[in-house]
């Protein structure tokens, strides 16, 4: 079976094409569009510019799927559409222009599917899972391989930076402002922060950027998939520096995320401190794998079992 999954996110819109054969899932193609929908919010609604960006990406992906004769695909949206006050208008507009009606994933469901996806790549026992998107951050605490608590915070790398940063590069004062905003949101969860979770699992663009930047700056081996809390802290210190010699190398490694990098790293660093994490494992699997496993494979397998009975 070959199946396409389109993730309509707040910062990026992605297409993943999966092949399922002999009990194994293989990612055969991955496409990304930097849409920055979280920057297209005005008075709580998605603007015409944002709608046009979303429709452009969706029609592009429809063409890619059609060229490969892939008829089966699903489209879901996360904070990009769930947090706007003109959702129905936007959904109707997207349907009109693309023929697609995206499924809206709400926060807890997004966090759960993140966990399903990462569990396919790691033997999860105890730790914290974090998914920093453009418009939200999902957190999952798990013990003995099972979810203990999960939540979605409506603050992501892009909308946090939009709130606090006036220019392109964040100042030390703006970094402090972002820290205050994200810590207030974490406090509102009213979770028990007494227990330390040594291991964190990171998915999403900020986590991948953290690994990429750490490899370049700290001579971490190319095959390594983990970084430390010290790596993240040092990157934040570089980003908050007034010296261009300190912050420019960071942005140079990942220039496409210049408008969300500081926001994402502030969120990552503050969550690491809250839960006492020492090591961050970066997962290649995430929400799209979780969606494919939970929504598509499970349904297909259930239908097959029913047909046998």
Give the role of each language-model region.
Residues 17, 40-67, 78-90, 96-126, ...:
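Helical "lid/coupling" subdomains associated with nucleotide-phosphate turnover
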Residues 1-26:
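N-terminal basic/disordered segments at the start of proteins
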Residues 3-7, 127-131, 200:
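Short glycine-aspartate micro-motif
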Residues 72-75:
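Conserved beta-strand/loop subsegment of P-loop NTPase cores
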Residues 10, 134, 205-208:
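Short, glycine/acidic-enriched loop or turn micro-motifs at the edges of active sites
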Residues 29-35, 202:
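A structural signal for short, well-ordered beta-strand segments
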Residues 23-28, 146-148:
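Beta-strand initiation motifs
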Residues 135-141:
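Acidic, divalent-metal-coordinating active-site segment for phosphoryl/phosphodiester hydrolysis
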């Amino acid at each position: 079976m070959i199946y396409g999954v389109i993730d309509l996110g707040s910062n990026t819109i992605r297409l993943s094409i999966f092949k399922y054969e002999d009990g194994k899932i293989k990612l055969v193609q991955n496409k990304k569009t930097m849409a920055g929908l979280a920057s297209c919010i005005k008075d709580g609604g998605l603007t015409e510019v944002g709608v046009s960006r979303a429709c452009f990406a969706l029609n592009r992906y429809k063409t890619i799927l059609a060229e490969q004769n892939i008829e089966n695909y699903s489209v879901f949206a996360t904070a990009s559409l769930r947090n706007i006050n003109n959702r129905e208008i936007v959904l109707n507009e997207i349907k009109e222009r693309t023929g697609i009606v995206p499924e809206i994933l709400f926060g807890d469901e997004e966090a759960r599917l993140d966990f399903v996806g990462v569990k396919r790549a790691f033997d999860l026992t105890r730790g914290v899972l974090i998914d920093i998107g453009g418009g939200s951050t999902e957190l999952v605490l798990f013990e003995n391989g099972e979810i203990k608590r999960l939540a979605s915070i409506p603050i992501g790398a892009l909308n946090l930076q939009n709130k606090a940063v006036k220019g392109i590069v964040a100042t030390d004062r703006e970094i402090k402002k972002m820290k205050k905003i994200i810590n207030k949101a974490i406090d509102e969860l009213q979770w028990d922060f007494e227990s330390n979770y040594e291991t964190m699992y990171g998915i999403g663009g900020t986590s991948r950027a953290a690994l990429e930047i750490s490899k370049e700056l700290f001579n971490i081996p190319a095959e390594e998939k983990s970084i430390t809390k010290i790596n993240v802290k040092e990157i934040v210190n570089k980003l908050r520096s007034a010296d261009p010699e300190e912050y420019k190398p960071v942005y140079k490694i990942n220039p496409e995320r210049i408008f969300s990098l500081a926001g994402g790293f502030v969120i990552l660093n503050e969550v690491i401190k809250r839960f006492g994490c020492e090591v961050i494992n970066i997962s290649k699997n995430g929400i799209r794998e979780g969606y494919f496993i939970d929504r598509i494979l499970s349904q297909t397998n259930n239908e097959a079992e029913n047909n046998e009975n």
